[in-house]
UniProtKB/Swiss-Prot annotation:
Protein family per UniProt: Belongs to the universal ribosomal protein uS5 family.
The keyword Transmembrane is assigned to this record: no
Family matches, as InterPro entries: Ribosomal_Su5_D2-typ_SF, Ribosomal_uS5, Ribosomal_uS5_bac-type, Ribosomal_uS5_C, Ribosomal_uS5_N, Ribosomal_uS5_N_CS, Ribsml_uS5_D2-typ_fold_subgr
Single GO BP term: translation
GO molecular function, one term: rRNA binding
Domain comment in the entry: The N-terminal domain interacts with the head of the 30S subunit; the C-terminal domain interacts with the body and contacts protein S4. The interaction surface between S4 and S5 is involved in control of translational fidelity.
Alphabetic keyword roster: Ribonucleoprotein, Ribosomal protein, RNA-binding, rRNA-binding
Protein name stated in the entry: Small ribosomal subunit protein uS5
Length: 172
């Protein structure tokens, strides 16, 4: 199975969503009569204000696979609570053999993250974050682990509601 890593491409459509293609892989299905070639695309979509979604698409042609992935990413979008262009608190995410550590950063730090994680933060609109990946560097697993970590975030209001206290008491 030949592997073809694509450059991360950005695109902004008329609906205001940011789209990034993370990878396109050439895949092969072996049948009795020979090989059937196809393509698998991995994309992320975000609104630049905390909403993000991931999609994957498979087809015989690259543009069709990318289009399917973009449509799936738009359907799978969810909201991430941000605080001044960064994360609320440090969080760990895991998927498969990939583990990621996501930490908030001060203004001026920028996005310190590798490959697929950087694409997720770019489409989300995060300006300052530090991210470190451990284990598998498979782009699909890294994106899923990053999204897992982002889903685990909680706001001070969420924590206050769980503890039965006011937000002022939590923030101290």
């Amino acid at each position: 199975m030949a592997k073809m890593q694509a450059k991360v491409q950005a695109d902004e459509r008329d609906d205001g969503l940011r789209e990034k293609m993370i990878s396109v892989n050439r895949v092969t299905k072996v049948v009795k009569g020979g090989r059937i070639l196809g393509f698998a695309a991995l994309t992320v979509v975000g609104d630049g204000d905390g909403r993000v979604g991931m999609g994957k698409g498979k087809a015989k042609e690259v543009p069709v696979a990318v289009q399917k992935a973009m449509e799936q990413a738009r359907r799978n979008m969810f909201k991430v609570p941000l605080k001044n262009g960064t994360l609320q608190h440090e969080v760990h995410g895991k998927h498969g053999a990939s583990t990621v550590l996501l930490a908030p950063a001060k203004d001026g730090t920028g996005v310190i993250a590798g490959g697929p994680m950087r694409a997720v933060f770019d489409v989300m609109g995060v300006q300052n974050v530090v991210a470190k990946s451990h284990g598998s560097t498979n782009p699909y697993n890294l994106v899923r682990a990053t999204l897992d970590g982002l889903r685990k975030q909680s706001t001070p209001a969420d924590i206050a509601a769980k503890r039965g206290k006011s937000v002022e008491e939590i923030l101290g």
